[in-house]
Structures are given as C-alpha cells and as structure tokens.
Design a protein with these regions (language model features):
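Catalytic cores of nucleotide-sugar-dependent glycosyltransferases that transfer UDP/GDP/TDP-activated
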Residues: 1-205
Length: 205
C-alpha cells in the first residue's frame, strides 16, 4: 500500500586516498514512501524517506552490532544532508537527531555545510536518551591520543579515527538545542555522578 520513488545520491566520504578500496563517494538511493490513498486524493500525511545502500544497510540483518557501525551512522548523517542539499522540492526547518548515532549530523551541518545557502538556516535539536553510550568505544577508558574533543574535523569514513569519534559529544557541541527524556534526567546528567564525563560540556551549553 505504498507509492515508491527512487533517486541516486552521491555521498562524499572525504577520503584522501587514491586507493580504489576507499572511494571518494558512496552511492545511495533515497526511497520515498507515500500512502497510495494520499497520493491520489491529495491529503496531507507523513511522507517517509529511507536512505539505501547495499553494502552498509541492505546486507545487514540488524540495526546495531557491526564493527563498521561508525561508518554506517556517518553515512546516514552525511547522506541526509546531501539529499536535502540536492533535493529542490522540500527542506525542513528543524532536524531532530537522537543519541550518538546521529550526533554526526549536527556536526556536519555546522561545519562542512555551514556556508551552504540551502542548508545553513536549518536548526538542529539533539535528544539525549542515554548519555552512557557515546560511540564505538568505552568513553571512560580512552587513550590521550584517541580523545575526541568534538571540535576537530570529521575524519574520512574509512579512517581508523572514525571509530574513536564521540558522536554524543559532537551532537551536544554542535546542536542548536539540546533536550532529553525528562527534566529529572536533564538535571542528573549535569552532575559528575551521572554526567559520563560530559557534565561540564552540558553545563556550558
């Protein structure tokens, strides 16, 4: 009961390598779902878009639990922004990101796309559901050389550094508005006891 459209999308990977195993772009499709009843009678309903990539999404049976999850979530964040940049039919006023997996989007929007005429006016809201999960690593045991301050440029999708990027910190750092699941949790995570080493940053924001 769905109407579907497909369009190709080239997502930059920021790869600096000439190695063919590290492509400069990943090709995705954007699938648009519109209920058939709404497509025919013109009623206003929620339209859903899905970013598709055979290697990083279609071949996987689960949402989480892969060694390259950081690449998969980075691709999603960058892919969403590339779709909005190249699609001339629709643009949101606000993008809502949730937890470390989409904190990269807030980062990209305020750095890579900060001067883009089409995207720079979009506001971002970052929702914290569980501050404990901050990336593909245990944030409590990070070597000094692997520490992510949230300000350095995002690495290439294929750089080993991508596995050490703190998506939670970057979402908090770059979002326009930060919110969480309850007023109580909002107060708790601004304390050393529950702040998971981000309480200082949260207080600053």
């Amino acid at each position: 009961n769905l109407h579907m459209e497909l369009e190709g999308l080239q997502v930059p990977t920021d790869s600096q390598s000439s190695n063919e195993t590290e492509p400069a772009y990943l090709t995705c499709n954007v699938r648009k779902y519109v209920p058939k009843s709404d497509a025919t009678n013109g009623s206003d309903s929620v339209i859903t878009y899905f970013l598709e990539n055979l290697e990083y999404y279609e071949k996987r049976s689960n949402i989480y639990g892969y060694n390259d999850d950081a690449v998969r979530w980075t691709l999603l964040s960058r892919g969403v922004l590339e779709f909005l940049r190249t699609s001339r039919n629709w643009l949101p006023d606000v993008i809502v990101s949730s937890d470390w997996q989409t904190g990269f989007l807030c980062n990209y929007l305020r750095t890579t796309y900060k001067d883009d005429e089409r995207l720079r006016r979009i506001a971002t809201v970052f929702i914290i559901h569980n501050l404990y999960y901050q990336g593909m690593f245990d944030h409590r045991f990070v070597a000094e050389m692997d520490y992510d301050d949230g300000q350095s440029p995002m690495p290439s999708f294929f750089s080993p550094r991508i596995l050490k990027i703190n998506g939670m910190r970057r979402g908090i750092t770059h979002a326009d508005v930060i919110t969480t699941v309850s007023p109580t949790y909002a107060q708790e995570i601004m304390t050393p006891e529950y702040g998971e080493l981000l309480d200082g940053l949260l207080k600053e924001r």
